[in-house]
Amino acid sequence: MIVVTSFVRNSAVAAVASTPWNVRLRELAYQSLFSESISLYRSMLRSGSSPDAFSFPFILKSCASLSLPVSGQQLHCHVTKGGCETEPFVLTALISMYCKCGLVADARKVFEENPQSSQLSVCYNALISGYTANSKVTDAAYMFRRMKETGVSVDSVTMLGLVPLCTVPEYLWLGRSLHGQCVKGGLDSEVAVLNSFITMYMKCGSVEAGRRLFDEMPVKGLITWNAVISGYSQNGLAYDVLELYEQMKSSGVCPDPFTLVSVLSSCAHLGAKKIGHEVGKLVESNGFVPNVFVSNASISMYARCGNLAKARAVFDIMPVKSLVSWTAMIGCYGMHGMGEIGLMLFDDMIKRGIRPDGAVFVMVLSACSHSGLTDKGLELFRAMKREYKLEPGPEHYSCLVDLLGRAGRLDEAMEFIESMPVEPDGAVWGALLGACKIHKNVDMAELAFAKVIEFEPNNIGYYVLMSNIYSDSKNQEGIWRIRVMMRERAFRKKPGYSYVEHKGRVHLFLAGDRSHEQTEEVHRMLDELETSVMELAGNMDCDRGEEVSSTTREHSERLAIAFGILNSIPGTEILVIKNLRVCEDCHVFLKQVSKIVDRQFVVRDASRFHYFKDGVCSCKDYW
């Protein structure tokens, strides 16, 4: 868009006449009607009115917001012709415009060519913020140092421009230094500055420092609460999110969509369906459904808490569905082993003219894999490049290897890997290793393991997986070899844990842990269930029973299920969330227990959802 082709400088009378234009320009800028603001500016020039130092900041803001560098450069000429280049607010607007258009060198030139700039904190602040927005860490730090050396006062705006640079761990040292300078300079009473430091600490993983700063604040507004809640969520501290959310409500602060996205994500992580349902009702009653981010988080929460019907209901009533919404819903069906419905939704998306991206295809291929739709998955993989002109990435190749591997077509999976146009990465070899575990192919597993640890030598999961493959084949030498490798690397096996919700409280069970308040009752219930399972099996596999008793009887999902049976009404469904893949022994155990107690158990593990009912599992032993 071109602002104007010529600029005529008129008399003082014309400048006075510009005042009503300035009022309207300001209104349009405040309403974010930037295109209309530029059109009005052109009309202003055609009418013979001359812009002044009050006009330029608004129109420059419009050019910056629309990222119109050519129009911005033309305006710069108008500023010079109008003699306004020394006005502080015009200078600041020019610097900001160039920075927002990505022309940081031009912004720096404006700063350096105007001697007045080096005496004004607003000009320094504009340039520092611009460098930060363009990830120019060294330049921003240099300008800050220069600002202090020349005696220009550092204010809260300066800090708000600098702190976002320090939201990655490698620059946390700089952030701590800035925090110290804030305290020394008396800026630590500024709420906006403190909020930015809380966000910085949280994003850098320094959660305790962020929480300490939060606790020290005498007055906490919505933005402050959100900074800590979202920080906990980003660091995987779902328990803390829900606890702080309750404190926030008790303090009288009402949540907004940003709060709810973090809370819904935490409910999804923990499987806290009761709390999630309450938050879902709040979303509906407060009119947040049109917010696509909240609705997407609601879809994920309901689906990951086992309520796929409600997830679909939220999806269906969304007035506007983003590509992320479609991707999430398709992924939900895949996670629940309902790949056929996921593919129907994908077809519906295509018919509506929505173009898929790589992320959608990851979900579609994964859905095919978990539902045994091997040929359909192969067809879609070919269509990805042929029909949609999308180049497959490593994640798509690993999905296809998983697809073939789960179906037992291991030789085809290996041929596919060997024919890949790019070098297979760890995810590809890891998918093959997982398939070898399912189909007990030790020779191919050894090859896949050797390859995968070249890419991910510190991923303990692959060592555990290979050890289990050796265990299944009774290869004691192989087991010891893996243990030696793990010992040499000082690995510790990731502990398994499971969540189960009861009366709005989420209970955590660790494998082998006896710290829960009902541990004695839980273990008595577990003993009774194991006795019933042995009776049901007719002691047909006594040796296996002894092995299971000694190695897996205290796996976390068993403890969680026993707790759920103890604390719920007979016949009700029990939802358990596990961080690792359910082992084969526990999978068999849960199928048998579901028949004995006549219950449905819904278990979400690291792989998918399992619905145990009447002695069978929805995954058809295919996970």
UniProtKB/Swiss-Prot annotation:
PROSITE patterns: PPR
GO BP of this protein: cytidine to uridine editing; mRNA processing
Keyword Repeat: yes
Keywords tagged on the record: Mitochondrion, mRNA processing, Repeat, Transit peptide
Disulfide bridge positions per record: none
PPR repeats: 17-51, 52-86, 87-117, 120-154, 155-189, 190-220, 221-255, 256-290, 291-321, 322-356, 357-387, 393-423
GO CC terms in record: mitochondrion
SUBUNIT field: Interacts with MORF8/RIP1.
Protein's UniProt name: Putative pentatricopeptide repeat-containing protein At3g11460, mitochondrial
Source species: Arabidopsis thaliana
